[in-house]
């Protein structure tokens, strides 16, 4: 069976979602997107450059968060699928979304605030231990919200083009969230600079302990704005209700109706080659998007030696470019298909990597490079999510497990990659020595060009063996 094709015995196709319903769904991940923007772009920079923790210590905290997220994601996905029909008031997906939202709101501000009770004599390991529980709670909440929100896509719409449109709208608000974070960061840094008396000095143009209030205020703004949009999601999105499973009684038929659709369980997915093909492509995509977002601030600060305002303006340009690209996804997919759309996005990212390799001093051309990176990342991310929805097709009862498994590989791979990069950092006794200038230059090349080649190989496998279920026999017993 090809995912997305109608199955025998299936009910009538649901009506198309209204614009209000589509927008309500799209803002449901806004809090997660705001927090993820700060997490990936500023966590290492905050811990290493502002709090002066070692590169390995900062990488260890990010690894802890990614592993916690990765472990929680498939568990939440499995439980969300298992809870179908049990949450009579709001539905299992929305219930998990609410739990995750509360965890994020309560934990995230502590991550970007100074350690309570810590002083100048506090050893680094004790401070890192303090941040650990907040990071674990935050990542559990983030995973619960993400999986609940993603698994609603095949629940709400069935058409391929509607899935692309909903995914593109979701990503458009992801871009808006990133623009909001970087715009707020630029404003806070500018206000801090104008409040400083005396002529501007070189030290004031670079990050340091004086920037702690900027990140603390930014984290509080993030959770405040995100809470409002989460409320709008819960008020405007209706999850399709499923009747709870009933115990058989004397009036129940002994044989199930012949028209009932067999269920594709989580263990069946593990036998499908397409599950691993799409999973590898999704993991490669997330590595490119997340690692480039994580290290772009380091690259700007240490390799290009730009003032600290660029850690807000360059990511802002990237996500404006991504925002514009997201609206082209639906017509481009219709014209050239999923695979070619993804390939075009990869070509743009590889062009960025080649530019970084060939040019050491970008100057004002760094804005053009940011446009390329932002547009390419938006294209491959939206397309990979649409491919995942294609894989799930009508089997929405186990969709959360699929998204959970995909996210598990992505989160753990991201965490391990960051830890490896941080362990290779050449400056052990200071924040940045001469060697780290070239170090972050080649990190940006590796996380875009190197991982881009791996993504190309994954895409080639989908061209040879397209997405479809090959091993599952609907007539076999689970």
Curated annotation (Swiss-Prot):
According to its UniProt entry, the protein's GO biological process terms are: alternative mRNA splicing, via spliceosome; carbohydrate transport; cysteine transmembrane transport; melanin biosynthetic process; negative regulation of melanin biosynthetic process; pigment metabolic process involved in pigmentation
Q: Which keywords accompany this UniProt record?
A: Acetylation, Amino-acid transport, Lysosome, Melanin biosynthesis, Membrane, Transmembrane, Transmembrane helix, Transport
Cellular compartments per GO CC: cytoplasm; late endosome; lysosomal membrane; lysosome; melanosome membrane; nuclear body
Residues spanning the membrane: 27-47, 57-77, 98-118, 125-145, 169-189, 217-237, 278-300, 309-329, 339-359, 362-382, 401-421, 437-457
Please indicate the ranges of residues that lie on the Cytoplasmic side: 1-26, 78-97, 146-168, 238-277, 330-338, 383-400, 458-478
GO MF, one term, reads: symporter activity
Entry membrane topology: Multi-pass membrane protein
> For side Lumenal, which residue ranges?
48-56, 119-124, 190-216, 301-308, 360-361, 422-436
Family membership? Belongs to the major facilitator superfamily.
What name is this protein filed under?
Major facilitator superfamily domain-containing protein 12
Q: What is the lineage of its organism?
A: Eukaryota, Metazoa, Chordata, Craniata, Vertebrata
Q: Which gene encodes it?
A: MFSD12
């Amino acid at each position: 069976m090809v995912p997305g094709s109608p199955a025998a015995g299936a009910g009538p196709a649901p009506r198309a979602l209204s614009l209000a319903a589509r927008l309500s769904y799209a803002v449901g991940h806004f809090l997660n997107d705001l927090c993820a923007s700060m997490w990936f772009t500023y966590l290492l920079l905050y811990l290493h450059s502002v709090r002066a923790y070692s590169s390995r210590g900062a990488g260890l905290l990010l690894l802890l968060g990614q592993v916690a997220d990765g472990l929680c994601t498939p568990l939440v996905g499995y439980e969300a699928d298992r809870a179908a029909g049990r949450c009579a008031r709001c539905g299992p997906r929305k219930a998990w979304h609410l739990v995750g939202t509360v965890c994020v709101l309560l934990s995230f501000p502590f991550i970007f605030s100074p350690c309570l009770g810590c002083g100048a004599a506090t050893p680094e390991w004790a401070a890192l231990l303090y941040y650990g529980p907040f990071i674990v709670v935050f990542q559990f909440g983030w995973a619960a919200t993400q999986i609940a929100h993603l698994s609603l896509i095949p629940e709400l719409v069935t058409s391929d083009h509607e899935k692309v449109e909903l995914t593109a709208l979701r990503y458009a608000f992801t871009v808006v969230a990133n623009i909001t974070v970087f715009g707020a960061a630029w404003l806070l840094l500018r206000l801090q600079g104008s409040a400083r008396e005396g002529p501007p000095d070189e030290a004031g143009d670079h990050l340091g302990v004086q920037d702690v209030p900027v990140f603390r205020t930014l984290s509080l703004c993030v959770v405040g704005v995100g809470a409002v949009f989460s409320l709008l999601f819960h008020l405007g999105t209706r999850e399709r209700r499923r009747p709870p499973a009933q115990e058989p009684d004397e009036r129940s038929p002994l044989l199930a109706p012949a028209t009932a659709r067999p269920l594709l369980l989580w263990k069946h997915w593990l036998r499908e080659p397409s599950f691993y093909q799409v999973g590898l492509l999704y993991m490669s995509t997330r590595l490119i998007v997340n690692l480039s977002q994580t290290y772009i601030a380091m690259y700007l600060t240490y390799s290009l030696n730009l003032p600290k305002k660029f850690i807000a303006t360059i990511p802002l340009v990237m996500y404006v470019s991504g925002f514009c690209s997201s609206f082209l996804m639906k017509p481009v997919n219709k014209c050239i298909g999923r695979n070619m759309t993804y390939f075009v996005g990869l070509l743009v990212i590889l062009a960025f990597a080649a530019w970084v390799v060939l040019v050491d001093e970008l100057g004002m051309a760094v804005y053009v490079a940011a446009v390329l990176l932002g547009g390419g990342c938006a294209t491959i991310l939206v397309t990979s999510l649409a491919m995942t929805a294609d894989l799930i097709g009508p089997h929405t009862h186990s969709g959360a497990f699929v998204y959970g498994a995909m996210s598990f590989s992505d989160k753990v791979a991201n965490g391990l990659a960051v830890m490896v990069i941080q362990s290779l950092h050449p400056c052990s006794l200071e924040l940045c020595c001469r060697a780290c200038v070239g170090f972050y230059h080649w990190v940006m090349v590796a996380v875009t060009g190197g991982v881009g080649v791996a993504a190309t190989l994954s895409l080639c496998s989908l061209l040879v063996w397209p997405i479809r279920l090959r091993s599952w026999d609907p007539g076999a017993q689970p």
